[in-house]
Amino acid sequence: MSTSAVPALDKTFQILDLITASQQPLTAAYIAKELKLPRSSTHNILQSLLTKHVIYKDSEGRFHLGSYLLYWAGKYEQQQGVVQLFKDLIMQYPILLQHTVTLSKMDLGEVVFLACHEAPAPLGFTFRAGVRVPAVFSATGKAML
């Protein structure tokens, strides 16, 4: 049993986390079964998320993450203001243009990549904004620890 003040919100985040972690879109029945939630609660939460475009439902009745999440991500970036500063600083120091440089933050034991300047080299790593990696498994995370 949940000790949260708002159990429905906890269920909502469980659903969103499951959809996010899945390699494929999921049906409502699968979500309810996997999370051991009542089907009616699952249905109601999914409908609420659909109306806000936090998720969308394809023609086969499967659920995907929706476009509204990009709005939140954009607003987060604006409020933090550090991504533009990061880009400006990269341009001020030309030596950095030759290297892959990431802007990251630590969040609950994970490194979250906020922005990346990629080296012009043909081979290298690509870091996408929003990707989370356990801190102990990345050089960036180890440096932060």
Name what the model sees in each region:
Residues 1-79:
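N-terminal helix-turn-helix
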